[in-house]
């Protein structure tokens, strides 16, 4: 009886919105004597498994850092391969995601992304548009600082008096605001592969997120690792700068 109540209480403490910095693909591949692109391909398969498990756990939104504005500085061949991954991912896994009632969305600047990449994202979003389960949100060509700048520029163009700008008003113009009305900022942000930094991911939105740094490289991050991160979150005491 007590265990059932405890389990129910923990489920009620689920993070609604999880952000994931999928790190370690290249290092994982190097350890296996493989090229970096081998790690990116393995990471694609991990993403499907983690997304499905998150949806089944009852997570409402999962935002994954797929490609940052800084990633353009990587070798040309690697960038080209990464840009092909959405095409492969959606063609391979959209049927599974549809069956799991998962919605596909994207944030980030469309300008600069290859047409084939954008077409695959748009097609996946359209094919899952009638789903009402977890939102799987891909941050592509995304940077947190750039997100804030674009929001301010948009407000300035609309004639907004920026001297009266509030946090609430700015939040409404950030890219995550288009995902869902009244979308929560990330409750939990996970970074894999042992690195402990945010790397310009959801800079504004992560102000009060709980952070979880997993030692596991992204290609090895699975449903059990996600459960460990959620369990750690459930043990945190979130005070939002106050005192309890």
UniProtKB/Swiss-Prot annotation:
InterPro entries attached to this UniProt entry: UPP_synth-like (IPR001441), UPP_synth-like_CS (IPR018520), UPP_synth-like_sf (IPR036424)
Highest taxon of source: Bacteria
Cofactor note: Binds 2 magnesium ions per subunit.
Residues involved in substrate binding: 24-28, 36, 40, 68-70, 72, 74, 191, 197-199
Listed EC numbers: 2.5.1.-
UniProt family annotation: Belongs to the UPP synthase family.
Official protein name in the record: Isoprenyl transferase
């Amino acid at each position: 009886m007590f265990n059932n109540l405890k389990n129910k209480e923990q489920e009620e403490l689920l993070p609604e919105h999880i952000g994931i910095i999928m790190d370690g693909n290249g290092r994982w591949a190097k350890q296996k004597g493989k090229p970096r692109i081998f790690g990116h391909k393995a990471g694609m398969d991990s993403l499907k498994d983690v997304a499905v498990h998150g949806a089944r756990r009852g997570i409402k939104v999962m935002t994954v850092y797929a490609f940052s504005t800084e990633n353009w500085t990587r070798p040309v061949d690697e960038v080209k391969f990464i840009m092909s991954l959405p095409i492969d991912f959606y063609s391979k896994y959209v049927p599974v995601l549809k069956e799991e009632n998962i919605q596909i969305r994207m944030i980030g600047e469309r300008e600069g992304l290859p047409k084939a990449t954008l077409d695959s994202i748009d097609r996946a979003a359209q094919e899952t548009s009638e789903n009402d389960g977890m939102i799987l949100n891909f941050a592509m060509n995304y940077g947190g600082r750039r997100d804030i700048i674009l929001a301010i520029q948009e407000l300035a163009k609309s004639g907004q008096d920026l001297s009266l700008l509030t946090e609430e008003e700015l939040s409404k113009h950030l890219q995550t605001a288009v995902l869902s009305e009244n979308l929560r900022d990330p409750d939990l942000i996970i970074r894999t592969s042992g690195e402990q930094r945010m790397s310009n991911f959801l800079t504004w939105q992560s102000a009060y997120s709980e952070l979880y740094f997993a030692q596991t490289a992204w290609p090895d991050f699975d449903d059990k690792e996600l459960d460990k991160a959620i369990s750690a979150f459930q043990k945190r005491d979130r005070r939002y700068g106050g005192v309890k």
